[in-house]
C-alpha cells in the first residue's frame, strides 16, 4: 500500500475492542506502531491503515505486506525484520527458524542476540508481525496472543 507522501503524515490511532493501535506515518511510510492504553488526544482516528486493521481484527485475512515501512535500524536487524515480514499469516516460527530465514546462524550467540534484539526493538509491530515468532517481540504479550487468535480462526 503506497501512502500519499504529500498528505499522509502524522499520528493516527484508534481504539479496538481489546487495545489501541497507534501508527506514525512520515513521507508516506509507517515509521512507528505502538499499543498505548488510550487514543492520544493529538492523534487523528481516520486512516486507511486503521480501517484495514479493523477488518483484520474482524477476521479478514490481511498480510500487510504491501504496507511501506521505514526501518531505520542496523543492517543485520533489518534482515531479521524483513524475514519476519515473510512469515505467512496464521503461522508461527521459532527464533531459530527466523534466524535461518534471515541468513543467520541460530547456534551463534551473536546471531541469536541480533534476532532477539531486532524483534524486541521492532518499530512497526503488526506490519512486521513479530507476534508470529515464538520469542521476544515489540508487540505486548496480551496483544500478540489476540493477534495470533485472530489469525488462527
Show the residue positions of the predicted features.
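Nucleic acid-binding interface residues in structured DNA/RNA-binding domains
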Residues: 63-153
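Basic nucleic-acid-binding alpha-helical/helix-turn surface characteristic of O6-alkylguanine DNA
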Residues: 1-105
Amino acid at each position: 500500500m503506497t501512502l500519499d507522501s504529500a498528505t499522509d503524515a502524522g499520528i493516527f490511532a484508534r481504539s479496538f475492542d481489546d487495545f489501541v493501535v497507534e501508527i506514525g506515518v512520515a513521507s508516506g511510510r509507517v515509521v512507528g506502531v505502538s499499543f498505548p492504553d488510550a487514543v492520544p488526544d493529538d492523534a487523528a482516528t481516520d486512516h486507511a491503515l486503521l480501517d484495514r486493521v479493523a477488518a483484520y481484527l474482524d477476521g479478514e485475512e490481511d498480510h500487510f505486506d504491501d504496507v511501506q515501512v521505514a526501518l531505520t535500524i542496523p543492517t543485520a536487524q533489518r534482515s531479521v525484520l524483513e524475514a519476519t515480514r515473510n512469515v505467512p499469516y496464521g503461522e508461527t516460527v521459532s527464533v531459530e527458524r527466523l534466524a535461518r530465514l534471515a541468513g543467520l546462524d541460530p547456534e551463534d550467540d551473536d546471531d541469536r542476540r541480533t534476532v532477539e534484539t531486532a524483534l524486541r526493538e521492532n518499530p512497526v509491530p503488526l506490519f512486521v508481525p513479530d507476534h508470529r515468532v515464538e520469542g521476544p517481540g515489540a508487540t505486548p504479550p496480551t496483544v500478540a496472543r489476540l493477534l495470533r487468535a485472530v489469525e488462527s480462526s
